[in-house]
């Protein structure tokens, strides 16, 4: 007699870089016969329903999205990017959303209970609304909680020679200063929710709270952790477009033959959140405007977006509003982007080295430091690059074989990790 699969209650903060990896794995679970309820913001309702999930919306403070964050965290407009802003964002955006997140999670669990079914919760690093479960807050309990690591790991790590940007995050005093306000807020919130246990230091609680923590990267892209909790393990990257069974674009752009025939293809994007094309994309176009043997494809990151009329697009450049990375990257020599964690995984899954221009914005320094440490990336160390800086970086990466060699090594490592299988194994263990 077959064991009935638990209902999966997936949860993600309503930001593209957080929803994307969870939804990618959820699609795989749906294909394997799981029923999925997805808790996230209304901005992602359509995507969640299209995937085949039951949608449960976040409410109030938790229902934000990329473009209205200053409304709930006005300090983002005045505090410069860096550690202070990181600590502020952690508290104002993520910790203070816990009550509404937990409320939505309970709504989802009640729906599952009403059908006399069991549930396993799958969250992601910054969906802190799963913490009340392990801390004894009143409410329904799932059979287990799995958290997916959708951002660079924040556990204590050994020093990494040659990566000075990591030093502040390793220093215990700095970690305490930056994240103590968030820790204090979480303690107060847990009291309000009726939790019977007090949370640990915030950065530790994120990893010790779930039954299983699956970091979505291979070991080679993470610093050597000093003391990860028992449930922590690596799971490789989330399935990308093709491996997740999604359809390729219904029609390729008219310039697609140019991609296939290009001697050298450079792909550049600024992601979907921090979009000022003058920071990185336009300088990249300008950097190679006179190189006939190079094709530059710029992805604007938002459907319907276009460059200002004042921007002259070089003859060797092609601009597209929105396009799957996995269609272009197999043909690319280098990927220039703003340092999102998912973008790094996408690029390296195709063996393509990266150039990162994210400056000190949110988790971008953490991603860049790992790319540099692993030898697969070049950090521009600024949010506002010049064409000269971009040109210098690309020339160094293309002229240094080790970048490509190490990127290919990570690609092979990623191929050994079957993230969907690893996730399903964890689900089975908790549901048995």
Swiss-Prot record:
Entry annotated with the keyword Transferase: yes
CDD domains for this protein: GT1_Gtf-like
Induction remarks: Induced in early stationary phase (at protein level).
Pfam families documented for this protein: EryCIII-like_C, Glyco_transf_28
Catalytic activity annotation: (9Z)-17-hydroxyoctadec-9-enoate 17-O-beta-D-glucoside + UDP-alpha-D-glucose = (9Z)-17-hydroxyoctadec-9-enoate 17-O-sophoroside + UDP + H(+)
Record-annotated membrane-spanning stretches: none
Function according to Swiss-Prot or TrEMBL: Catalyzes the second glycosylation step of sophorolipid biosynthesis, the further glucosylation of the previoulsy formed glucolipid to give rise to an acidic sophorolipid.
Family to which this protein belongs: Belongs to the UDP-glycosyltransferase family.
Name of this protein: UDP-glucosyltransferase B1
Natural source organism: Starmerella bombicola (Yeast)
